[in-house]
Amino acid sequence: MNDLQTIRTRAAKMFILFIFAHIVLIPIIAIILDVPFLDVTIMAIAVSLAVGLTWKFAGINAAATHYIIAVGLSLMPAIITYLFKGHPWQIDIHMYFFASLAMVTALCNWRAIIIAAATVAVHHLVLNFLLPVAIFPSGADFFRVVLHAVIVIAETVVLLWLAIKLEAAFSQGAAALSE
């Protein structure tokens, strides 16, 4: 296993554990907020199972595993944002989307970054119209969705550049060592 694969393996394992930790974290947050937790816990279990099963059947460094990890890292903030619906901190919880998108970079896989960003974008756009209180305390706000999209695009461009450069650097390093 080369250095890039080692980093990807460690990152993927860490993220799988992190995603599964939400099965415990989400009901705890719900209890603290004094809100129902069965629906959000089921959502967290479903996302975690999708991640875990993909890892089991595709392998830790399979593209599919990286992609489902990216989706999982994007959906957990969505579930927690929904959990905070109507709470004064709901809009603050959106920072978790930006943090989770940045975390995907540790996979050094630019496609996973695009998938994570697309998951966040689709989530915001769809829920803005179907269930706006699940994302914004004041309800539907198309221009807020556009603002968030611009920020996510800016972050994604930088993360893509970084992931591509990291992958190239590891490839060049491996080529230099083999000479």
Model-derived segments and their meaning:
Residues 14-89, 93-102, 120-122:
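Hydrophobic transmembrane alpha-helices and their membrane-interface boundaries in multi-pass
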Residues 98-115:
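Canonical bilayer-spanning transmembrane alpha-helix
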Residues 1-9:
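Short, Lys/Arg-rich, polar N-terminal cytosolic tail immediately upstream
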Residues 28-47, 51, 87-88, 110, ...:
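Alpha-helical transmembrane segments and their interfaces in multipass membrane proteins
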Residues 3, 56-59, 95, 134-141, ...:
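Juxtamembrane loop-helix boundary motifs flanking transmembrane segments in multi-pass membrane proteins
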Residues 171-173, 177-179:
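Long cytosolic alpha-helical coiled-coil signaling stalks of chemosensory transducers
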Residues 9-12, 16, 72, 147-154, ...:
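Alpha-helical transmembrane segments of integral membrane proteins
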